[in-house]
């Protein structure tokens, strides 16, 4: 027994707590056979509540009026009973209410910046290769780049019971490689495509199994007979069939390379120090049509066709490519073009992406005219500036100012932007 009693969180759903039954026995049967039911638990709450109040001189019941995860902002039925019944019938009880408000000022979050100490710079230099995806990460958020490539914080790994986006894309790429690998160096004709389309339709299960076995991390997906993964399997079949039929309209063309690695070594003079960087890319498909070399990249994710298919009529667009992450496909296309042209100087080259979510539109070309040497040089000049910024010890890794960039970032909890 206490003279002064304070009870916190007297909200409906907390006091009494919401009842949930995990019993397989229906409520009516439990009630009939006098087994414990939710009403009994509520009665226990009521007993202990009023027993606590019985000999107290001053009782303070506190509840939260704000809605949240664990509260609907509604005061408990016990408070209503005290106000409307207990206080009304007992003249010795005086009940009154107070609404307390406070100006709460949340502490301002400090922006996170990572200085480029000698140790951090050494971590950057140990990064063997820089891909278009890696550099796009820096454009998106320098701090995210640091976490991923310098600090090498691993993203949370999950056991893949269902297809991840990565698994979907990797298996698609492997199937396309299997279908075209025997055609490298040959001119693909109408008849060959008709035969390929027919072969694919009749042997898809075998091709699927082969692709999953070649990608050893996806061996468990080789034999799918039911469930969501079977649906994904059928979606990939439809996508590949659409690609093959679209390729049929492009014949004749000659496949030069599939899933080939391309590299370019760059020497950067940063504050008088020479830093060697290797730029790397994996080209999905390189082909020749009408004496023009074409690099095609399959995209299983979402692509903004309005942005990616825009004609580049001025150099300002290349400037925006290095500032706007929404143009990352354009950045990747020019990045691949730069790698390829540095080892194939005489090629007339165009680059494009196969946006598989909008496959009906065919390939989106960066430009339908071959990339000029001036445009290539301008891109590489901007690329050098970006690389020097990454390795410049006077430029720290800072958070992006655009919160939208944090939406799918695996490290957003570190920055308190989740």
Stretch-by-stretch model annotation:
Residues 257-341:
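Non-catalytic protein-protein interaction segments used by genome-maintenance enzymes to assemble
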Residues 80-182, 402-403, 407, 411-412, ...:
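C-terminal, charged and often intrinsically disordered regions of DNA end-processing helicases
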Residues 23-31, 142-153, 209-216, 293-313, ...:
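Active-site-adjacent bridging/hinge elements
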Residues 1-89, 253, 300-301, 305-323:
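Conserved C-terminal motor-coupling region of P-loop helicases
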Residues 67, 88-97, 104-105, 325-328, ...:
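Metal-dependent nuclease catalytic regions and adjoining charged, substrate-binding loops involved
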Residues 174-267, 374:
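A non-catalytic, helix-rich entry segment at domain boundaries
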Residues 30-38, 60-62, 116-120, 124-134, ...:
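Glycine- and acidic
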Residues 1, 135-143, 160-171, 200-207, ...:
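Secondary-structure capping and boundary motifs in well-ordered enzyme cores
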């Amino acid at each position: 027994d206490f003279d002064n009693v304070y009870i916190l969180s007297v909200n409906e759903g907390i006091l009494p707590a919401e009842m949930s039954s995990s019993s397989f026995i229906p409520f009516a049967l439990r009630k009939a056979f006098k087994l414990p039911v939710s009403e009994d638990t509520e009665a226990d709450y009521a007993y202990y509540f009023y027993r606590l109040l019985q000999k107290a001189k001053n009782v303070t019941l506190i509840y939260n009026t704000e809605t949240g995860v664990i509260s609907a902002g509604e005061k408990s039925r016990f408070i209503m009973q005290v106000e409307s019944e207990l206080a009304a019938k007992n003249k010795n009880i005086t009940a009154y209410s107070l609404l307390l408000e406070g100006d709460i000022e949340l502490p301002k979050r400090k922006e996170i910046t990572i200085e480029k100490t000698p140790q951090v710079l050494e971590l950057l230099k140990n990064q063997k290769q820089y891909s278009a995806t890696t550099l796009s990460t820096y454009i998106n958020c320098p701090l995210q780049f640091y976490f991923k490539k310098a600090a090498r914080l691993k993203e949370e790994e999950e056991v893949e019971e269902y297809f991840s986006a990565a698994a979907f894309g990797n298996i698609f790429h492997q199937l396309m490689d299997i279908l075209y690998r025997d055609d490298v160096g040959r001119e693909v004709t109408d008849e060959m495509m008709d035969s390929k389309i027919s072969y694919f339709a009749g042997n898809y299960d075998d091709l699927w199994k082969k692709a999953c076995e070649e990608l050893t991390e996806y061996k468990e997906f080789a034999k799918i007979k039911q469930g969501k993964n079977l649906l994904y399997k059928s979606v990939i079949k439809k996508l590949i069939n659409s690609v093959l039929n679209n390729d049929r309209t492009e014949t004749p063309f000659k496949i030069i390379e599939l899933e080939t690695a391309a590299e370019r070594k760059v020497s950067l003079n940063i504050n008088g120090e020479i830093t060697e960087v290797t730029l790397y890319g994996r080209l999905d498909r390189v082909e020749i049509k009408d004496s023009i070399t074409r690099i095609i990249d399959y995209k299983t994710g979402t692509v903004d066709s309005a942005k990616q298919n825009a004609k580049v009529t001025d150099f300002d667009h290349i400037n925006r490519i290095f500032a706007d992450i929404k143009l990352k496909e354009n950045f990747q296309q020019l990045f691949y073009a730069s790698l390829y042209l540095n080892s194939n100087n005489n090629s007339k080259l165009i680059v494009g992406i196969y946006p598989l979510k909008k496959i009906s539109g065919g390939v989106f070309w960066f430009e339908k005219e071959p990339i000029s040497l001036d445009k290539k040089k301008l891109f590489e000049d901007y690329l050098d500036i970006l690389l020097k910024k990454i390795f410049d010890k006077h430029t720290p890794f800072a958070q992006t100012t655009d919160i939208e960039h944090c939406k799918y970032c695996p490290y957003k909890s570190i920055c308190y932007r989740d």
